[in-house]
């Protein structure tokens, strides 16, 4: 396909900024769609694009971060939440949790014009923190929302947050009491969360063992 210099420049800038590419004019958007239809690009989210070859070399987490960075640039007021926030904080988790969905905090329900891959997590009062230039729910609030995952999948996220000293058990407990969340799941996760867990694989295994009611491995 004939090179479109503006689009090539957009793709190069996006690569440098480790995010997906997007057009800012109708001409750029049309040119990007032509490359998409030609098979040169992929579109993981509406109006966002990435080089197909480069995209296929990335892990699911890296792909999610590329989308999040682009959406943060387009919608700087968005507060990313749940698994999306966990990714930006660098919390360890199983990549199988990624299904292309982007999670944001919202004081309102689902918008009629929302992209199918956008999930709004209702939060009446949204506690925020900026991390790497991206607006996120605080680590404590992020853990509350990640309690929605199955226990073995959520435990690595909790362990990682405590290991990184992003929050404390007491802070999460305090916020839990003030928030609408799954208190049973959060309480169980806080009971078994351990900052001494060295990596996500170890945390996942410990979570699976706990679920099967075997003895809890002693971490040193």
Where are these regions (language model features)?
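Short gly/ser-rich loop at a beta-strand->alpha-helix junction or flexible surface loop bordering the NTP-binding
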Residues: 1-182, 206, 218
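A short, highly charged nucleic-acid-interacting micro-segment common to nuclease
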Residues: 72-74, 188-204
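Residue-level signal for short amphipathic helical patches enriched in basic/charged
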Residues: 149, 196, 212
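Conserved hydrophobic/aromatic pocket- or pore-lining residues that grip, position, or stack substrates
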Residues: 209
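Active-site metal-binding core of divalent-cation-utilizing nuclease and nuclease-like domains
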Residues: 214-220
């Amino acid at each position: 396909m004939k090179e479109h210099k503006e689009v090539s420049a957009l793709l190069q800038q996006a690569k440098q900024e480790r995010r997906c590419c997007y057009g800012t004019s109708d001409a750029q958007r049309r040119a990007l769609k032509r490359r998409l239809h030609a098979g040169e690009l992929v579109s993981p989210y509406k109006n966002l694009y990435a080089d197909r070859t480069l995209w296929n070399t990335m892990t699911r987490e890296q792909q999610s971060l590329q989308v999040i960075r682009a959406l943060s640039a387009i919608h700087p007021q968005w507060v990313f939440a749940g698994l999306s926030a966990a990714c930006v904080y660098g919390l360890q988790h199983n990549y199988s949790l990624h299904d292309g969905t982007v999670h944001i905090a919202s004081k309102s329900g689902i918008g009629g014009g929302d992209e199918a891959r956008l999930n709004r997590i209702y939060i009446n009062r949204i506690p925020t923190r900026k991390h790497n230039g991206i607006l996120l729910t605080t680590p404590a609030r992020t853990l509350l929302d990640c309690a929605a995952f199955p226990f073995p999948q959520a435990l690595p996220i909790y362990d990682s947050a405590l290991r990184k000293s992003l929050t404390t058990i007491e802070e999460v407990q305090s916020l839990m009491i003030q928030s609408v969340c799954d208190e049973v799941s959060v309480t169980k996760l806080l009971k078994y969360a351990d900052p001494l867990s060295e990596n996500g694989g170890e945390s996942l295994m410990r979570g699976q063992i706990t679920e099967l009611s075997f003895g809890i491995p002693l971490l040193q």
